Curated annotation (Swiss-Prot):
Binding site for Mg(2+): N9, E386
Binding site for ATP: K16, H207, L208, G209, N210, G211, D282, C283, R284, G331, I332, G333, E334, N335
Keyword RNA-binding in record: no
Broad class of enzyme this protein falls into: transferase
Highest taxon, organism lineage: Bacteria
Co-factor note (free text): Mg(2+). Can also accept Mn(2+).
Gene Ontology molecular function: any one: magnesium ion binding
UniProt gene name: ackA
The keyword Magnesium is assigned to this record: yes
Name assigned to this protein: Acetate kinase
Feature type site, description Transition state stabilizer: H179, R240
Any single GO BP term: acetate metabolic process
Cofactor(s), by name: Mg(2+); Mn(2+)
C-alpha cells in the first residue's frame, strides 16, 4: 500500500492538518484546530467527505489537538498509512534554500530564524516537538518545508535594503519573501498550460489572500517578490498595511504618543482592507459593495492599484525576457473577479485585455485563462495547492 503524508501547519493559536497521497494528490483528511489556550478551543475536520467537530476543552493547545487527531479521528488503517510528516515552516532565513529532513541541527536553525518570525517559528517548533511525541515511529521522517526557500534565488540587488550593509551582514536584515510554496506550485502549473518547461517559464504570480504577495519568476526561479524582511511589506492585505513611508512610524510614536506595541498592532492587525473600510478585512465586502459604498470602493481601488503597480514593475524586472503569463491564486486571486479585472485594466498600456466572460467563470476552484484572444499577454487563474507541494517534498525526502 502506498504511504500517505501527514501535513502540519502550526500557528500560535491554531493547527491546520491534512493527510494526502503524494502521488495522486487525493486528500484523505483535512481539518483545523483553533482557539488554543482559550475556553472555547475546538477542532473541526473532514474525513472521506464527511465533516466532524468537537470541543478540545478549555486551555487546550497543540498537544491536545494532535492527541485528539490520533485517538479520535484517525482509524488504525489511516494512521498506519502515514509514512512521513511534512511541516510548513514560515521562515528558514538564508540557511535553508530547499526542504530538509528535520534533525537537531535543523531544529536549531528554525529556532535561530525565529528572530525574523517571532509569531510563527516558535509555534512550528512546538508542532515538531508534539509530532515527535505523537508519532515516535516517524521521528526520522519529519520534513521542514520553508515558505522562504523559493525566494532564495533572488539576486543581491533585489533582496538588500538600502540600509547600512552591516545590518545585513551582522543581523540578517534583508528581504526574504513568503508564500514561496504557493508561488512555486502555480508557476509549475501554468508552465504546463502554456506549454513551457518549468525551468524556462517566465511568469508573474499573485498569491492573494488575507496575506498577499507577488513574485517575478524568470526561468523558473524567483528573482523578486513583494514581501520583505517580514510578511508586512508589499501589497495591501486583509489587515496589514503593506508598503508605507517608514517615517509614519516615527510620527505615530513621537507625535501621536503610540507605543511600539500599539504601532505594530496597527500596521499588522488594523490596516489593509480593514483600515480602509473601517468595517472588515474581508475582500468580499469590498467586492460586493464596490458600486454603492464609498468605503468598499476606497479599499478595492487601493488594493488593485497597489497590485497593478507591482505587476507592472515586475514586467520591467523581467527585462528583455518574454512573459509567459500572469497568474492569480489564493482565496482572493481565485474568486474575486472584480479584483482581477480592475487590476489588469490598469495594465492596458501593455496591451492586456480581460475577457469578462472568462474572468467571471474562473472562480470556486475553476482554473482558466481570463484574457482575451487578442491580449498582448495572457493571464490565468490557477488554484494553489501548497499542501500537495509539502506532501511531495516530504515524500521525496522521507519515503
Amino acid at each position: 500500500m502506498s504511504k500517505n503524508i501527514l501535513i502540519l501547519n502550526c500557528g500560535s493559536s491554531s493547527l491546520k492538518f491534512a493527510i494526502l497521497d503524494p502521488a495522486s494528490g487525493d486528500e484523505k483528511l483535512s481539518g483545523l484546530a483553533e482557539n488554543f489556550n482559550l475556553v472555547d478551543a475546538r477542532i473541526k475536520w473532514k474525513l472521506n467527505g464527511e465533516k466532524g467537530a468537537a470541543d478540545l476543552g478549555a486551555g487546550a493547545a497543540h498537544s491536545e489537538a494532535l492527541n485528539y487527531i490520533v485517538k479520535n479521528i484517525l482509524s488504525a488503517e489511516l494512521k498506519d498509512s502515514i509514512g512521513a510528516i511534512g511541516h510548513r515552516i514560515v521562515h528558514g532565513g538564508e540557511k535553508y534554500t530547499s526542504s530538509i529532513v528535520i534533525t537537531d541541527e535543523v531544529v536549531a536553525g528554525i529556532k535561530e530564524a525565529a528572530a525574523f518570525a517571532p509569531l510563527h517559528n516558535p509555534a512550528h517548533l512546538i508542532g515538531i516537538e508534539e509530532a515527535f511525541k505523537a508519532f515516535p515511529e516517524l521521528k526520522e521522517k519529519n520534513v521542514a518545508v520553508f515558505d522562504t526557500a523559493f525566494h532564495q534565488t533572488m539576486p543581491e540587488h533585489a533582496y538588500l535594503y538600502a540600509l547600512p550593509y552591516s545590518l545585513y551582514k551582522e543581523h540578517g536584515v534583508r528581504r526574504y519573501g513568503f508564500h514561496g510554496t504557493s508561488h512555486y506550485y502555480v508557476s509549475r502549473e501554468v508552465a504546463k498550460v502554456v506549454g513551457v518547461e518549468p525551468s524556462k517559464v517566465n511568469v508573474i504570480t499573485c498569491h492573494l489572500g488575507n496575506g498577499a504577495s507577488v513574485a517575478a519568476i524568470r526561468n523558473g526561479k524567483c528573482i523578486d517578490t513583494s514581501m520583505g524582511f517580514t510578511p508586512l511589506e508589499g501589497l495591501v492585505m486583509g489587515t496589514r498595511s503593506g508598503d508605507l513611508d517608514p517615517a509614519i512610524i516615527f510620527f505615530m510614536h513621537n507625535t501621536l504618543g503610540m507605543s511600539v506595541k500599539e504601532i505594530e498592532e496597527t500596521l499588522v492587525k488594523k490596516s489593509g482592507l480593514l483600515g480602509l473600510t473601517e468595517v472588515t478585512s474581508d475582500c468580499r465586502y469590498a467586492e460586493d459593495n464596490y458600486a454603492t459604498h464609498a468605503d468598499a470602493k476606497r479599499a478595492m481601488d487601493g488594493f488593485c492599484y497597489r497590485l497593478a503597480k507591482y505587476i507592472g514593475a515586475y514586467m520591467a524586472v523581467l527585462g528583455d525576457d518574454h512573459l509567459d503569463a500572469i497568474v492569480f491564486t489564493g482565496g482572493i486571486g481565485e474568486n474575486a473577479g472584480l479584483v482581477r479585472e480592475l487590476t489588469l485594466n490598469y495594465l492596458k498600456l501593455f496591451g492586456i485585455k480581460v475577457d469578462s466572460e472568462k474572468n467571471t467563470a474562473a472562480r470556486f476552484g475553476k482554473s482558466g485563462e481570463i484574457t482575451a484572444a487578442d491580449s498582448a499577454f495572457r493571464a490565468f487563474v490557477i488554484p494553489t495547492n501548497e499542501e500537495l507541494v509539502i506532501a511531495q517534498d516530504t515524500a521525496c525526502l522521507a519515503l
